[in-house]
Amino acid sequence: MGVHSFLCSSPWFRMVTDLQKEIQEAVQQRRNFAIISHPDAGKTTLTEKLLLYGGAIQEAGAVKAKRSQRAATSDWMELEKQRGISITSTVLQFNYHDCTINLLDTPGHQDFSEDTYRTLAAADNAVMLEDAAKGLEPQTRKLFEVCRMRNIPIFTFFNKMDRPGREPLELLDEIEQELGLQTYAVNWPIGSGDRFRGVFDRRKQQVHLFERSVHGKRQAKDTTLEWGDPQLADLIEPDLLQQLQDELELLEGVGTEFDLEAIHAGQLTPVFWGSAMTNFGVELFLEAFLDYALKPGARRSSVGDMAPDYPEFSGFVFKLQANMDPRHRDRIAFVRVCTGKFEKDMTVQHARSGRTLRLSRPQKLFGQDREVLDDAYPGDVIGLNNPGMFAIGDTIYTGKRLEYDGIPCFSPEIFAYLRNPNPSKFKPFRKGVSELREEGAVQIMYSADSAKRDPILAAVGQLQLEVVQYRLENEYGVETLLEPLPFSVARWVEGGWDVLEKVGRLFNTTTVKDTWGRPVLLFKNEWNLRQIEADHPELQLRSVAPVAAGQEPIEV
């Protein structure tokens, strides 16, 4: 017997290949995506309707629901329920047909984009949700740029077609012209506003006519007719039918051809139309998404690209959340599984510290609800109890040492000193600030002047600062004061402290240090920034800073 034959017949080899086969089968069934949108585009509504069709919930509850209705499944923090907006990212896993779908629900409110940036690091696909009356909006553009940095596939869903909106062809043109992204309409709307009659599915050449379900709470009844069915003339007004025919001919004649490779490269976006509130087009979108979306794939690490069927387990932390259950004062690390098979009670290595950890109480997350998890595969997200060990971007693994690329910090736009007026509350104040910093609720910076000890909160929007104050008071019993600072732009100095010292005094800017002690310059406006960039290119100012892998944050 040759060496190759001997190895192939050995129990160890069979065990590895059986495990790889099991992982490959699980990966084939996995789809993972995040929804990016501007506030009020209907993100929470679409999320709930996807869960409704996936059987994960029996009844969808509007976000700003009446008291008799349920609160939205994906909004669980008390402040979110009060305001009717999503502030933190949550993870929702559900099954549809033979697929397991991991929906990384991100905040749609404009003040919470940094949490969204981090969530996009764990997503394989993004769904760009747009209001058909408004088209592209500023928040969506920002998030699109983050998707482009990672070259992930983007699926577009134009929502609120049952309300007056812009012309569909005009909306496609806007995406192509402003984002440089080619479009392919997978389905096409029949009318709009109060004359919205449904959609035409170009994949199967079928017309889907929808009846509104009661407030969209239940799955919509779907009447499906083949294109060319004589009944269409009785069910759709002649002018709408003619308009549909003309627009379809135009799409076939001058529209982009379908190209799955271009979709996977993030160069072509499949486009869908519907109304999440009334369930129009939601299931059609879901079925096409499962066919077209990228399955969990290889991810770049310190030892090269890691394929998902690599038999050793690995994953990275993309989010931390404290006090998901205020009764237990818990802290949860959200881990995206990248390779291998995760199993309850397994022992892993923590790359940054080198410590060995036993993962004894892993959890499957569904908004605020959790259940103990026995196993998970690439593309899944698991919740781990976090006794202060994990930081955003951390890698855990079995087998040979590896580390995944860090999750970058993005430039904040609002800055304020956080003051603790009550000296007797110093310990809970420090603990609260430290835990909220670890969680990534806000960036924490400090003055380069060591005499100024108060932390500087750095956020992408005012509401983020309010959330920190709210949580410090409600979860740690500490009342705080904010002292706004007159800056709106931050840039990391890639050249480091040495280069900064050689440059000497800089006008119209203030120097601070970030969580890892790296120099950051704060500017009052873009004009001041451009002036310093022109005068001192050696500073190498950056708007995005990588997570400082392997470094411990400085003490609060």
From Swiss-Prot:
Q: Which SUPFAM superfamilies match?
A: EF-G C-terminal domain-like (SSF54980), P-loop containing nucleoside triphosphate hydrolases (SSF52540), Translation proteins (SSF50447)
Q: Which InterPro entries match?
A: EF-G-like_DII, EFG_III/V, G_TR_CS, P-loop_NTPase, PrfC, RF3_C, RF3_dom_3_sf, RF3_GTP-bd
Q: Which GO terms describe its biological process?
A: regulation of translational termination
Annotated localization: Cytoplasm
Q: Keywords in alphabetical order, please.
A: Cytoplasm, GTP-binding, Nucleotide-binding, Protein biosynthesis
Q: Where is the tr-type G domain?
A: 28-297
**Record-level GO cellular component terms:** cytosol
The residues that the entry says bind GTP are 37-44, 105-109, 159-162
Give the protein's biological function: Increases the formation of ribosomal termination complexes and stimulates activities of RF-1 and RF-2. It binds guanine nucleotides and has strong preference for UGA stop codons. It may interact directly with the ribosome. The stimulation of RF-1 and RF-2 is significantly reduced by GTP and GDP, but not by GMP.
Identify this protein by name: Peptide chain release factor 3
Q: Which organism is it from?
A: Synechococcus elongatus (strain ATCC 33912 / PCC 7942 / FACHB-805)
**Classification of source organism:** Bacteria, Bacillati, Cyanobacteriota, Cyanophyceae, Synechococcales
Per the record, the gene is prfC
